[in-house]
């Protein structure tokens, strides 16, 4: 499969079909030059790649068990529930679940290989939920399970068709010396909410839960710890150095906010009214 995201043509050569199903909305069609387009990147996966992702997920689940309490909506907690279902299943169901698990972990391996290369195209992965309104993008970031997806859903409820989901989980951000653009990708969370678009990024908002809604603009220095935590950190040393350069650029390219919020639409009313100014 040849698909296009972040203005790059990417060919996937995989062992399972799962990742091709995931990326089909982003596939290059023949009438759009897909038949003759050259890939900017070719990604091949191996059994070792799948094993790495499975082992990593198991370590994360073990950490969650030891150092909870786990958030009921967190990725790790959902993984624990899936593992329990797998152990309790009959042999036929277990085989089907194993095939699903392999495919899902291979999809993670594919994206890892992609984002390892992206810093050399001035692009990084920042974990969060991104929504566009009137041609400007807003990214909400926080630890898993805090309510990022819920908050952008409230934006869509509030703003209707004006609000377009860019990516609900793992968007890519291209950063120049003075501006940032955010892209949809197929790796878009459990609800599969994304659009294959590029939108100027206006603001990044750090989200935390609270009973009462409040928002304030913060400095880039205050935002830095969560940026470092939620940005994908490449294993390759050169890519990691470039990622640090891109984070530094991002700190001067967009505005930063801290939002304490509940799950009422009034939270979206507040955040949109302040961040869109």
Feature-to-residue mapping (PLM):
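Conserved lysine of the Walker
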Residues: 148
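A noncatalytic interaction/capping subdomain that flanks phosphate/NTP-handling catalytic cores
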Residues: 1-144, 154-164, 172-277
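Hydrophobic positions on the alpha1 helix immediately C-terminal to the Walker A/P-loop
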Residues: 151
């Amino acid at each position: 499969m040849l698909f296009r995201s972040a203005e790059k043509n990417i060919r996937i050569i995989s062992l399972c079909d799962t990742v091709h199903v995931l990326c089909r909305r982003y596939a290059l069609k023949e009438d759009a030059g897909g038949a003759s387009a050259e890939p900017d990147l070719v990604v091949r996966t191996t059994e070792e790649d799948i094993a790495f992702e499975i082992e990593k997920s198991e370590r994360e689940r073990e950490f969650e068990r030891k150092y909870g309490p786990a958030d009921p909506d967190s990725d790790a907690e959902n993984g624990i529930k899936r593992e329990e279902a797998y152990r309790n299943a009959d042999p036929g169901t277990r085989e089907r679940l194993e095939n699903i698990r392999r495919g899902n972990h291979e999809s993670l391996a594919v994206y890892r290989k992609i984002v390892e290369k992206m810093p050399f195209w001035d692009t990084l992965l920042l974990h969060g939920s991104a929504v566009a309104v009137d041609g400007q993008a807003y990214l909400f970031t926080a630890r898993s399970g805090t309510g990022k997806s819920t908050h952008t859903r409230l934006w869509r409820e509030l703003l209707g068709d004006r609000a377009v989901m860019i990516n609900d989980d793992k968007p890519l951000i291209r950063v120049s010396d003075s501006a940032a653009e955010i892209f949809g990708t197929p790796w878009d969370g459990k609800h599969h909410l994304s659009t294959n678009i590029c939108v100027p990024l206006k603001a990044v908002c750090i989200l935390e839960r609270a009973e009462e809604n409040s928002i304030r603009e913060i400095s880039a220095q205050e935002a830095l710890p969560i940026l470092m935590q939620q940005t994908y950190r490449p294993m390759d040393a050169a890519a990691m150095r470039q990622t640090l350069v891109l984070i530094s650029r991002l700190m001067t390219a967009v505005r930063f906010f801290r939002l304490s919020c509940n799950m009422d639409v009034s939270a979206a009313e507040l955040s949109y009214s302040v961040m869109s100014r």
